[in-house]
């Protein structure tokens, strides 16, 4: 087996775990950075596929709860829009972000 493949695979899996858990990045941002580093798309897909969906969703909720404390807005809609924009900047997928934000009590 090619050494580069094994190292890329290990690197991608560790990168995904670290960025989701410590940095609070979403799948889109992680994918972009791994592509920039020259990791094969199949390896990226495999590494991202090992992410626990429920834990990923909970991480997004935690991030938004923290951010909600500092967001200033004139209306509930505006606050939710700002929270959604923040989550998408961190690389979370739009449909998931809006699903979570709609449930939010601001």
State where each predicted segment sits.
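An alpha-helical, amphipathic repeat domain used for nucleic-acid recognition
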Residues: 1-106
């Amino acid at each position: 087996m090619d050494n580069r493949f094994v190292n890329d695979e290990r690197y991608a899996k560790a990168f995904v775990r670290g960025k989701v858990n410590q940095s609070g990045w979403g799948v889109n941002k992680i994918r972009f950075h791994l592509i920039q580093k020259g990791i094969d798309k199949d390896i990226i897909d495999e590494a991202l596929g090992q992410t626990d969906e429920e834990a990923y969703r909970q991480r997004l909720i935690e991030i938004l709860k923290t951010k909600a404390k500092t967001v200033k807005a004139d209306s509930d809609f505006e606050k939710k829009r700002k929270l959604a924009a923040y989550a998408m900047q961190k690389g979370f997928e739009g449909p998931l972000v809006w699903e979570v934000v709609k449930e939010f009590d601001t």
